[in-house]
Amino acid sequence: MTRPETPQAPDFDFEKSRTALLGYRIMAWTTGIWLIALCYEIVSHLVFHHEIRWIEVVHGWVYFVYVLTAFNLAIKVRWPIGKTVGVLLAGTVPLLGIIVEHFQTKDVKTRFGLRHSRT
């Protein structure tokens, strides 16, 4: 009697995951910096009545790219939906996105052995 063919799960692609992690890390820091700049712009507008309107536009586009890169990483490392949403929302709080990036990077590198290159 022959065994039925069962589909195999695709192998984990370390290089794609490493690239996704790098993109996420860069965008988490970039989003955090632009969010701090946006907070400065809001204080400057409300307290000193300065008009700096381009920072919010740049931050919006940077956050959009952050969402894409974080979602890409979530798919690559198979995060559950709750964790993915938490990481995405962390990018909306000043400094929290950078803190979450640190812990998520540490977790992904530990879980998948991305500390050393695979050959």
Curated annotation (Swiss-Prot):
Subcellular localization(s) per the UniProt record? Cell membrane
Tell me where the transmembrane regions lie. 28-48, 55-75, 80-100
Q: Which UniProt keywords apply?
A: Cell membrane, Membrane, Transmembrane, Transmembrane helix
Membrane in keyword set: yes
Q: Name the domain of life this protein comes from.
A: Bacteria
Provide the primary localization. Answer: membrane
The UniProt entry lists membrane topology as: Multi-pass membrane protein
Similarity comment text for this entry: To M.tuberculosis Rv1342c.
Q: What is this protein called?
A: Uncharacterized protein ML1176
